[in-house]
């Protein structure tokens, strides 16, 4: 699946960064891999480069994100956020981070910019990887909880030695989410949701 965007992620990220003072901008660029290298730096590495603690870097990062969200540039990027919201919705409302990024671009620098835009934007929410699920983005908390709960239930009801063919697994999973909007109850989206875990 390849999704064409009506905006340029690198230009949008650059515009959002203009709302920041130089040091905050540099920290965000390093933290999210928005510079010449798409490699992200850890809080610790950035702290050592600036001679400050990891916690201070985290505070600067959080302040910078809030500054961007209150800026004129953020408001001007509304169409960007709306488009990403529609994409996530079309992919099921909750989607594995790497699948979302790969569907838009394979370029690591572009993916870093998209990740940054998602972090900054409303109504995007990210859940960290855990023992049950991969990193994922969602726009509706209730839907995300419903899907994750149904996936846990599906896997709990499978026996370790049980082989289940994909169509049967999809059918069973869809029976667990009968109260989810019809727009999401497709085989393609069910497969995408099964990929969350």
Predicted regions and their residues:
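C-terminal non-catalytic scaffold/interaction domains in large multidomain proteins
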Residues: 1-197
């Amino acid at each position: 699946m390849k999704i064409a965007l009506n905006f340029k992620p690198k230009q949008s990220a650059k515009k959002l960064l203009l709302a920041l003072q130089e040091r905050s901008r540099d920290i965000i660029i390093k933290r999210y891999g928005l510079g010449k290298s798409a490699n992200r730096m850890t809080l610790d590495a950035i702290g050592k480069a600036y001679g400050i603690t990891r916690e201070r870097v985290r505070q600067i990062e959080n302040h910078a994100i809030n500054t961007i969200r209150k800026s004129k540039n953020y408001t001007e990027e509304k169409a960007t956020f709306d488009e990403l919201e529609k994409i996530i919705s079309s992919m099921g409302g909750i989607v594995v981070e790497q699948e979302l990024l790969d569907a838009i671009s394979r370029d690591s620098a572009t993916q870093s910019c998209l990740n940054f835009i998602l972090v900054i934007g409303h109504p995007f929410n990210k859940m960290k990887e855990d023992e049950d699920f991969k990193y994922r983005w969602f726009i509706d908390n209730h839907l995300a909880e419903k899907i994750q709960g149904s996936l846990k239930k599906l896997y709990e009801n499978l026996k370790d030695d049980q082989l289940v063919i994909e169509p049967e697994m999809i059918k069973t999973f869809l029976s667990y989410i009968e109260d989810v909007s019809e727009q999401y109850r497709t085989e393609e989206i069910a497969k995408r949701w099964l990929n969350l875990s």
